[in-house]
Structures are given as C-alpha cells and as structure tokens.
Design a protein with these regions (language model features):
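Transmembrane beta-barrel strands of outer-membrane/channel proteins
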Residues: 39-54, 91-101, 136, 143-149, ...
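Surface-exposed loop and membrane-interface regions of Gram-negative outer-membrane beta-barrel proteins
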Residues: 88-136, 151-168
Length: 327
C-alpha cells in the first residue's frame, strides 16, 4: 500500500514539474525583436614541403581547402542564421563561396586526380560552393533546399562528423524535410521527445558512376525531458544509389528503385543488387545518456556502424566496437 502511494506521489510530482501538455519553445514569449545577417570574407594561403598539406587544415571544411602543399584561397559569404526559436516560424540560409588556386598533384603517383581527388582533375584552380541554401521551420517541421553539407544531426562537436557522414565531405545539392530538433510528443508533458528527417541529395564527384544520388533518413527518441537524467536512441540510414556507369547504363533512377533503396530491398540491374539490396547501404546507431542541471549538461554516447543487415544496438556487435564519446 505504501509503495503504491509512493509511486502515485512520484508520478504526480513529475507531472507537476510542468502542466503544459505540449511544452514547445513556441509556447514561450518571443523576446527576440530582430533578425541578423553575418558577412564573412577571408584570404588564406598554405605552404609545405610534403606532397600534401597538413590534414588538420582540411578538417570540417566540406572539401573547400586544397590538399596540395601550396595553395591560396579567397572566401566570401553572407549568412542568415536562425534566431527565433520561440516564433512559430524561423528561417535561415547562406551563400558561401570559396575560390582556390593550388599547386598540381604529383601525376606520376596520383594519376592527375582521376581517382581519389576529382576536384583537382587537370586543374590548378577551383571555385567551390560551400553553401547556397535556404531553410524554413514552420512550427515543428523543417524544410531545406540548396547546396549544403549533409548533416546527420549526431552530437560529435569535437570530431569531423559521425561514423556515417563526414564534415570533410563536399556540400551537395540537397532536399530535406524533417523534425530536426528534439520535439515533445503531445500529451506527455515533454518527457518523451522525438526527431527525424528524410534527405535526398545528388552526388557531384562523378567518379566511375555519374549522377548518382544519396538517400539519407534518421529517427530518434529521447526519454526524460526536464528530468536530471535523459536517455536517447537514434538510428541513421544512408545509401548511395542510381546514376549511370562508365558505359552509360542506367543503374536504377526511377521511383521503383527509390522504393527499393528506401526499404533496403533487393532489385536493380546488377547481379549483387538483385539478391542483396539495391544501392550501397550503411547504417549507424547512437545510444546516449545525458546528465543535466541548470545551465549545464554532460552527455556520454556510443555510436556503431552497420552494413547490410540491421541489428539493434548491443546485438550482433561487440560493445567495444564503435565510437565512445563525451560531450
């Protein structure tokens, strides 16, 4: 009897922390009275003695830095950040372009960039669009379109991306729809939150396979809300698919092929895809535990990588594999 009474009191106290049945940021007053623009311009140069520039120079730059030892670049950008999280709508966007000159690759060793480095293919100068996109949030739904990095929204602030998608990869023409930030489920007082999204992008490197595409989707749930301890789980799925091979053969670019890729079903024209899965598929999961208080939080997480078959986190993988992190 006493245990039952304690459980009831605990549930009442948790609910009493917030009687708002759907505690969205938009429920609070919007105290921001203006938007802002950021103007950016920069000039940089590198010089080195090896065949490549230092790897740290290229980290988190979306492929907009030269890998050769001598280079110079000019960057100009106009950025409109999202500044109104409590308004029922918000928007942001950017135009960010880098012009670059660089020393040639060692053709005897690297084949004039035909393989690993297509941006350097017979050139000593490039213009790279880092970002040219627009994003709109309508209440809880996010829409994005344009040239931008494909982000997997995983929490890796000290690295170059998650195990699945890298911040070193060039930006791509992209369409995206989703719920990009943790959003409470109506009626649960904010103690269960979800997020997820669907992205379609066009790859631009055109090595061996031309005009191929990227399919990416993710979903996550977080339990805890305003409690001192939160636990969250996310699943991310990416697949390269479609395009045309060197002989011009169609590798599957229609809606039926997209359905196979979306569901990771077999199909396509190649022998392997006819009994395996159409497209090249990779998945990743993240399990995270967050401790939080007023003005601070600390998160410990584990990410793993999946290929071909899905296994729930902890099944089919060694716990020591993957990435362990704290943020």
């Amino acid at each position: 009897m006493r245990k039952g009474l304690l459980v009831i009191l605990l549930l009442c106290s948790i609910a009493g922390m917030s009687w708002n049945w759907w505690p969205l940021p938009m429920a609070e007053p919007d105290t921001t009275d203006r938007d802002s623009l950021i103007y950016l311009a920069g000039l940089s140069a590198t010089a080195g003695s090896g065949r490549f520039s230092a790897s740290m120079i290229s980290e988190n730059e979306q492929g907009a830095t030269a890998i050769t030892p001598f280079s110079g670049s000019l960057r100009a950008a106009i950025i409109k950040p999202a500044t109104r999280p409590r308004r029922w709508y918000d928007y942001d966007g950017a135009i960010d372009i880098t012009g670059m000159i660089h020393s040639p690759l060692d053709e005897a060793i690297y084949g004039n960039g035909q393989g690993r480095f297509p941006v350097y293919r017979g050139k000593q100068g490039s213009v790279i669009i880092r970002q040219c996109y627009a994003h709109v949030r309508l209440y809880i739904i996010d829409f994005s379109a344009g040239v931008m990095p494909v982000s997997d929204h995983m929490d890796t602030p000290l690295g170059t991306g998650s195990l699945l998608l890298s911040h070193n990869a060039p930006s791509m023409p992209t369409l995206h729809i989703g719920i990009d930030r943790w959003t409470p489920i109506p009626g649960l007082f904010g103690y269960l939150e979800i997020k997820g999204g669907l992205t379609h992008a066009w790859l631009t490197d055109n090595i061996a396979v031309h005009n191929s595409m990227l399919h990416y989707k993710y979903a996550g749930a977080q339990l805890g809300g305003r409690l001192p301890v939160n636990i969250s789980y996310e699943f991310h799925h990416a697949a390269q698919w479609g395009g045309y091979d060197a002989a011009g053969n169609d590798l599957g670019n229609d809606l039926h092929s997209f359905k196979n890729v979306f569901l990771a079903h077999s199909g396509g024209h190649s022998y392997n895809e006819s009994f395996n899965a159409q497209g090249n598929h990779l998945g990743s999961q993240q399990l995270a535990l967050t401790l939080q208080g007023k003005g601070w939080h600390i998160k410990g997480y584990w990410q793993n990588l999946l290929e071909d078959n899905f296994n729930f986190i902890g099944r089919g993988q060694n716990l020591s594999d993957g990435r362990w992190g704290i943020s």
